[in-house]
């Protein structure tokens, strides 16, 4: 393959890891298990966040229908841990956002 062909071949997941996706919870692409690290988010709020994606901004999670005031407070306290990037099919197809089959 020529250099120009090699440059055109990009692994979209590796490319995504070079963004804030690798540093924060990407509300549009991250697996539900990532929310475990923040108190009060897993499993209930994490499921709601994943179910209601995609989001245009981090603050959009505060508009999920049916949230209690306590849930909104927990989300507000964690907004700094979230980011939003474009939905990447390789990360969200099938049921991988709920169960990616990785177990400790």
From Swiss-Prot:
<comment type="function">
    <text>One of the extrinsic, lumenal subunits of photosystem II (PSII). PSII is a light-driven water plastoquinone oxidoreductase, using light energy to abstract electrons from H(2)O, generating a proton gradient subsequently used for ATP formation. The extrinsic proteins stabilize the structure of photosystem II oxygen-evolving complex (OEC), the ion environment of oxygen evolution and protect the OEC against heat-induced inactivation. Requires cytochrome c-550 (PsbV) or OEC3 (PsbO) to bind to photosystem II (PSII).</text>
</comment>
<keyword id="KW-0604">Photosystem II</keyword>
<dbReference type="GO" id="GO:0009654">
    <property type="term" value="C:photosystem II oxygen evolving complex"/>
</dbReference>
<dbReference type="Pfam" id="PF06514">
    <property type="entry name" value="PsbU"/>
</dbReference>
<comment type="subunit">
    <text>PSII is composed of 1 copy each of membrane proteins PsbA, PsbB, PsbC, PsbD, PsbE, PsbF, PsbH, PsbI, PsbJ, PsbK, PsbL, PsbM, PsbT, PsbX, PsbY, PsbZ, Psb30/Ycf12, peripheral proteins PsbO, CyanoQ (PsbQ), PsbU, PsbV and a large number of cofactors. It forms dimeric complexes.</text>
</comment>
<dbReference type="InterPro" id="IPR010527">
    <property type="entry name" value="PSII_PsbU"/>
</dbReference>
<dbReference type="GO" id="GO:0042549">
    <property type="term" value="P:photosystem II stabilization"/>
</dbReference>
<keyword id="KW-0813">Transport</keyword>
<keyword id="KW-0472">Membrane</keyword>
<keyword id="KW-0249">Electron transport</keyword>
<dbReference type="GO" id="GO:0015979">
    <property type="term" value="P:photosynthesis"/>
</dbReference>
<dbReference type="GO" id="GO:0031676">
    <property type="term" value="C:plasma membrane-derived thylakoid membrane"/>
</dbReference>
<comment type="similarity">
    <text>Belongs to the PsbU family.</text>
</comment>
<protein>
    <recommendedName>
        <fullName>Photosystem II extrinsic protein U</fullName>
    </recommendedName>
</protein>
<dbReference type="GO" id="GO:0019898">
    <property type="term" value="C:extrinsic component of membrane"/>
</dbReference>
<keyword id="KW-0602">Photosynthesis</keyword>
<keyword id="KW-0793">Thylakoid</keyword>
């Amino acid at each position: 393959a020529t250099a120009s062909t090699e440059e055109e071949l990009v692994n979209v997941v590796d490319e995504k890891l070079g963004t804030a996706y690798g540093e924060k919870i990407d509300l549009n692409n991250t697996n539900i298990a990532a929310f475990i690290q923040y108190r009060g988010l897993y499993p209930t709020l994490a499921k709601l966040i994943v179910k209601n994606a995609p989001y245009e901004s981090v603050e959009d999670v505060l508009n999920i229908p049916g949230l209690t005031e306590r849930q909104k407070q927990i989300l507000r306290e964690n907004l700094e841990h979230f980011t939003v990037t474009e939905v990447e099919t390789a990360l969200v197809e099938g049921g991988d956002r709920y169960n990616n089959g990785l177990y400790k």
